Amino acid sequence: MIAAMDDFASFCPLTLTTDVIGDRWTPLVIREMLLGNTRFNDIARSLPGMSRSLLTQRLKHLERKGVVETWPSPSGRGNTYHLTPAGKDLQDVLMAMGRWSIAWMYDKLDPSEIDAESLMWWMHRRVDPTTVPDERVTVQFDHTAPERRTYWMVFERRAASVCVVDPGFPVGAVVRCPTEQLARVFSGSESWNAAVRSGTIDVSGRREVVRSMPSWFLWSPWAPDVREHVLAHR
């Protein structure tokens, strides 16, 4: 009987899939690449709990499985990492996994666990290039709790970058709030406008920046599913 089960396991498509993505970190590495990260340091920065040696192992594993390929870096130093067609096709798999957790484990999603720097990094990657102004605009984010931290997000040429040191540009708007509250907005648990109305997020600055800035963000890929879940369980 055991031999027969082993034979089926080697034939089962799900077994083949879990052999590729069936550990804690591999789906998250693929998530980062689906979000556009191609450089090792950027992927590592997005996964602060993962050691660099383990990331190296996971990338090599994915390359062996035909999910990732390496290209010479345009700078001539090192490589960049890119999803193959098979890797890109995992997007629907990961989205379904996220929707499952929202449906059945939503109460375990804890925004208070999110690190401020990781949140800012995620936010800057989820910027809508069609809405970001061409001219440079700097937004200062003052995290008031659990730790007081300040970051600057510079929007320019339809992209964004995050600074942990004041870049010295004129500030178009200042956002002040606890990290947890900003994480709730990013995840879709609460809308930006609702948070501003309630006073849990305070925004000041140039009127046109304050008004248009929320539309510059796409928020979490699962934000629409979270909003739907929240509305259904009110």
List the predicted regions and their residue ranges.
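Basic, helix-initiating cap at the start of DNA-binding domains
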Residues: 7-8, 16-20, 59, 78
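Short, intrinsically disordered or compositionally biased N-terminal tails of bacterial proteins
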Residues: 1-6
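Alpha-helix N-cap/N′ positions at the starts of helices
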Residues: 9-12, 177
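Feature captures hydrophobic
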Residues: 41-42, 50-234
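Alpha-helix initiation/capping motif
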Residues: 7-10, 112
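N-terminal helix-turn-helix DNA-binding core of bacterial DNA-binding proteins
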Residues: 12-53
